[in-house]
């Protein structure tokens, strides 16, 4: 029986191999186009990578000359960081100053008496207030722990309640204000006051003491060389004429009570010229006598003290002195309380006994020649009493922060003070034992890190440009930081764009920029990149011969120079990388500015790289269409060959069958004879 031949299955005549060999020749154009497509895609990806590297460099250099450049950053250090620290702004002056913390700002923190662990809080409308902030809620009664949770849910950033366990069966309730400052007193109203009284948290304030601070004529005395006898007393105020003053003792009982505060207002008022006291003695008139039409005058007094020419010709210079109010300490030191307002408005003063331990007297000095000082009569206040109630177990009472700066005592309601030292925020944590020195210095570490980042990104871009524009294998082997995979990938890109003059020109421009001179001020010490410790040969000193790697444009860092330069030349380094040469407040020169502008032509929308990738997009689309056309033709060609060879194989099989039939017939005929 003849073999059954099925085209494409038994492949009796090796037609599949014939078709395959024929199709390989037909696939040459397709293979060539596919390789070209891969080349286009690789080039496009490479251009995108170059764009990324250039963008990294642009971001790095922009940070060196932008508004938030690291050369303007400041750091503050304190000799007593646990008591006072500082946070400088970028515009803060480079200086050192002393700050003494006399007192930190505190908030009211009131404890109850010991309470039973199973105590129930009665129902009612509970109202708490801290200055003008109020917390009010209706409580239906229940456990103390539930009451505390309900209060805390409604009083965020105003007050806080907590339970302190004293023993197994005893506990205490703590309610505290979250707002510091002497004016931010914690007060209770409605059921809250009743509950505070019930738990022994507050009690009624005692009657006011009779020994409040008053100023009396028979108790004041001269202030230095200023006469106190000219001081005028009225029902509500005291008037201190020019060139006068007084010192009034403060009762020891008031000075010893830390909750007592003395308050009063003072203002300086201009007086008419005719009321100004004369600078020299004036003798009265000698007198006259008249009778009818005759008038006789007495002879003028002769003191036998002739005036000097200087006294006769030079009038006294007017004096303006707004430092008028002082507190006298026990050791005799006079502490100024702040100047008067020059516009005649009242200046309010508060003297807290807790702020001036051991104070002995209030001193008023009027050194002015054309102003009188008017002072309201002082009032003595017990700051612990609030609405007639005082805390019975205060863990802490509200008080202002108090510091001494430049010899002036300053009070603020918060421990964060940003309006005393220009562009510097003081952070108060604790009282200082002695004045702390705060130094404002440049942030040299931030500047150094920014420069190192710039060098790293610049060198990475320069390495990529060298790989793409040259064909020397040593360019890759010199890059020791490359991993094995990165080195293999770089080998595929080696010399890919060696005919791209835009990249070669861009590389030369970068080298010119980093090696150029940028004069700014006449006395600038650093006008070139290499003087700051960054150059193509920074790691060596002196001439060491020509090195091929140093001719490729990589930057090196001399860390000693880089550490030393910002110490005394931070402004020069800032100007080196970005400088306003024409005074229009816009940076228009410097290394960072020039690099940014140079790379902008590559990375901007419609720039060199965008143009290259756009062209490649067009080529990729065209190549993909060509591939689709070629693949379609090849499929038809292959199908046509399979059909023709199948028909040929079928014909051969048919002929073979006919041949077999004839052979069989002949064999049968011979065997029949």
UniProtKB/Swiss-Prot annotation:
Residues 650-673 have a biased composition (Polar residues). Keywords: Bacterial flagellum, Coiled coil, Periplasm. Residues 649-673 are annotated as: Disordered. The keyword Coiled coil applies. It comes from the Bacteria. One of its GO terms (biological process) is cell adhesion. It is found in: Periplasmic flagellum; Periplasm. Its main location: periplasm. InterPro entries: FliD (IPR040026), FliD_C (IPR010809), FliD_N (IPR003481). The keyword Coiled coil applies. GO terms for cellular component: bacterial-type flagellum filament cap; bacterial-type flagellum hook; periplasmic flagellum. NCBIfam families: PRK06664.1 (NF005188). Belongs to the FliD family. PANTHER family: FLAGELLAR CAP/ASSEMBLY PROTEIN FLID, FLAGELLAR HOOK-ASSOCIATED PROTEIN 2. Required for the morphogenesis and for the elongation of the flagellar filament by facilitating polymerization of the flagellin monomers at the tip of growing filament. Forms a capping structure, which prevents flagellin subunits (transported through the central channel of the flagellum) from leaking out without polymerization at the distal end. Homopentamer. This is Flagellar hook-associated protein 2. It comes from Treponema maltophilum.
């Amino acid at each position: 029986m003849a073999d059954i031949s099925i085209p494409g299955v038994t492949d009796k005549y090796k037609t599949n191999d014939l078709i395959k060999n024929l199709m390989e020749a037909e696939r040459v154009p397709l293979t060539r186009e596919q390789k070209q497509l891969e080349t286009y895609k690789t080039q496009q990806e490479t251009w995108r990578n170059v764009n990324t590297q250039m963008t990294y460099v642009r971001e790095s250099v922009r940070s060196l000359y932008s508004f938030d450049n690291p050369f303007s950053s400041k750091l503050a250090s304190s000799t007593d960081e646990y008591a006072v620290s500082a946070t400088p702004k970028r515009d803060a002056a480079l200086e050192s100053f002393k700050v003494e913390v006399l007192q930190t700002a505190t908030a009211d923190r009131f404890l109850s008496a010991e309470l039973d662990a199973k105590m129930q809080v009665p129902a009612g409308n509970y109202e708490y207030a801290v200055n003008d902030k109020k917390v009010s809620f209706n409580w239906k009664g229940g456990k103390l722990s539930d009451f505390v949770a309900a209060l805390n849910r409604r009083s965020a950033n105003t007050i806080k309640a907590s339970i302190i366990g004293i023993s197994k069966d005893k506990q205490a309730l703590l309610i505290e204000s979250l707002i510091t400052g002497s004016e931010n007193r914690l007060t209770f109203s409605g059921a809250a006051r009743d509950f505070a009284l019930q738990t022994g948290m507050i009690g009624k304030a005692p009657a006011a003491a009779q020994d409040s601070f008053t100023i009396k004529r028979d108790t004041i005395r001269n202030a230095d060389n200023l006469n106190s006898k000219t001081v005028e007393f009225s029902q509500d105020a005291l008037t201190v004429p020019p060139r006068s003053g007084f010192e009034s003792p403060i009762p020891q009982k008031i000075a010893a009570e830390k909750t007592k505060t003395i308050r009063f207002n003072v203002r300086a008022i201009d007086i008419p010229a005719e009321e100004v006291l004369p600078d020299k003695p004036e003798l009265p008139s000698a007198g006259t006598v008249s009778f009818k039409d005759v008038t006789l005058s007495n002879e003028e007094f002769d003191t036998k003290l002739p005036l000097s020419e200087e006294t006769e010709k030079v009038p006294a210079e007017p004096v303006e002195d707004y430092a008028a109010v002082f507190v006298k300490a026990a050791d005799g030191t006079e502490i100024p309380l702040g100047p008067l307002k020059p516009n005649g408005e009242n200046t309010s003063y508060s003297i807290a006994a807790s702020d001036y331990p051991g104070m002995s007297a209030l001193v008023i000095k009027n050194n002015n020649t054309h102003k009188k000082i008017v002072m309201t009569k002082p009032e003595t206040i017990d700051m612990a009493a609030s609405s007639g109630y005082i805390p019975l177990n205060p863990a802490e009472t509200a008080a202002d922060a108090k510091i001494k700066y430049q010899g002036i005592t300053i009070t603020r309601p918060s421990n964060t003070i940003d309006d005393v030292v220009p562009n510097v925020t003081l952070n108060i944590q604790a009282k200082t034992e002695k004045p702390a020195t705060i130094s404002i210095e440049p942030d040299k570490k931030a500047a150094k890190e920014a420069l190192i980042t710039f060098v790293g990104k610049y060198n990475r871009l320069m390495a990529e440009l060298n790989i793409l524009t040259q064909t020397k294998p040593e360019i890759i082997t010199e890059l020791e930081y490359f991993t094995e995979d990165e080195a293999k990938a770089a080998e595929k890109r080696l010399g890919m764009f060696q005919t791209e003059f835009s990249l070669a020109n861009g590389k030369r421009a970068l080298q010119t920029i980093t090696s150029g001179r940028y004069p700014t001020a006449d006395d600038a010490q650093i006008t070139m990149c290499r003087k700051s410790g960054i150059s193509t040969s920074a790691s060596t000193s002196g001439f060491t011969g020509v090195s091929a790697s140093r001719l490729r444009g990589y930057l090196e860092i001399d860390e000693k120079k880089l550490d030393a330069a910002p110490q005394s030349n931070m402004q020069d380094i800032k100007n080196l990388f970005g400088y306003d040469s024409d005074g229009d407040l816009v940076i228009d020169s410097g290394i960072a500015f020039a690099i940014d502008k140079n790379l902008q032509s590559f990375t901007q929308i419609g720039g060199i790289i965008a143009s290259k990738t756009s062209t490649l997009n067009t080529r990729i689309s065209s190549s993909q269409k060509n591939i689709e056309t070629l693949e379609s033709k090849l499929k038809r060609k292959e199908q046509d060959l399979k059909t023709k060879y199948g028909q040929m194989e079928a014909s051969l099989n048919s002929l073979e069958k006919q041949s077999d039939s004839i052979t069989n017939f002949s064999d049968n005929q011979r065997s029949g004879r």
